[in-house]
Regions:
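Hydrophobic core segments of alpha-helical transmembrane domains in multi-pass membrane transport
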Residues: 39-50, 70-75, 95-97, 137-147, ...
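N-terminal membrane topogenic signal
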Residues: 25-38
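Hydrophobic transmembrane alpha-helical segments of multi-pass transport and channel proteins
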Residues: 99, 143, 147, 254-266
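Juxtamembrane helix-loop transition segments at the membrane interface in multi-pass membrane proteins
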Residues: 2-7, 12-27, 57, 64, ...
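Membrane-interfacial loop-to-helix junctions in multi-pass transporters
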Residues: 33, 128-133, 263
Length: 278
């Protein structure tokens, strides 16, 4: 294609496939990896609004448990906290996903009196025919997660963030001294400065992410109480069940739902504690 050339010269021919428009700042390319996180968050929000069939809910609950196990294994295999620098974002998405599942299971428990095979299996296995046993086991798991692991991990993250920020000026001065003495070159100095900045950002993010885990533990307790009390009200007043039958049915589903949500939450809390204590 003919285009106008410089002043005093003839027309030039543009090569095939060459863009004739002026080159500006290129827009960032949208890749599958970049779209995975927004798509996951949108899917979780949709899951909170739209009722899910029991088959899909069983699949998502199993996926939640498997993801928590994988996160725990990944946190145990890192040697430094920065080796898993995306852990705060991963923690946020996992917590949001678990809360979305809690909303979906609560809708099924109160609306239809069932919540799929996974929750029923967990409730039957742990309770062993006794409502008291199931509730006691659930409360023990909540106490372990909330009082022991979550509070400890939150405190470690707070102290780590504070000491990392306090130590930054001294580390920067040490890098400058090594650079001026010729011990390291410019590339190594840049790498060390970047690592220090990344470490401060990581512990600051983990400080906030630990608060999310703590709030998730509180939300789990509240949701369990809502499921139990709301199930009794729905069973007795709307479905006409006897108090004993309503207690047996909805306590089984409530304990199963609580265990299915608390076991992944416990695993991720342990992962958080392992990461911040590296």
């Amino acid at each position: 294609m003919l285009t106008a050339g410089p002043e005093g010269s003839g027309p030039t021919v543009a090569k095939d496939g060459e863009d004739e428009s002026p080159k500006g700042n290129p827009l960032p390319r949208t890749t599958t990896a970049n779209m995975a996180l927004p798509a996951a968050v949108v899917g979780i929000v949709v899951m909170m609004v739209i009722p899910l069939p029991t088959t899909l809910l069983d699949l998502l609950l199993s996926l939640n448990i498997a993801a928590a196990v994988l996160i725990l294994l990944a946190s145990m295999n890192v040697t430094r906290a920065l080796d898993l620098a995306s852990f705060p974002s991963l923690l946020l998405v996992a917590t949001l996903f678990r809360l979305g599942l809690n909303v979906s299971t609560t809708r099924l428990i109160l609306g239809e009196g069932e919540a799929g095979g996974v929750i029923t299996a967990f409730g039957s296995f742990v309770m062993g025919g006794s409502v008291v046993v199931g509730l006691v086991v659930f409360l023990i798991l909540v106490v372990i997660q909330f009082v022991v692991i979550t509070n400890g991990a939150t405190r470690v993250a707070e102290v780590g963030a504070r000491f990392t920020l306090d130590a930054m000026p001294g580390k920067q001065m040490a890098i400058d001294a090594d650079l001026n003495a010729g011990i390291i070159d410019d590339a190594e100095a840049t790498r060390r400065r970047t690592e220090i900045s990344s470490e401060a950002d990581f512990y600051g993010a983990m400080d906030g992410a630990s608060k999310i885990v703590k709030g998730d533990a509180i939300a789990g307790i509240v949701i369990t109480l809502i499921n139990l009390d709301g199930g009794l009200i729905v069973g007795v007043l709307q479905q006409g069940l006897a108090i004993g039958d309503a207690t047996s049915t909805y306590s089984l589903l409530t304990v199963g739902d609580g265990l299915v949500s608390q076991i992944p939450a416990l695993l991720i809390s342990i992962s958080s504690g392992i990461i911040v204590t590296r």
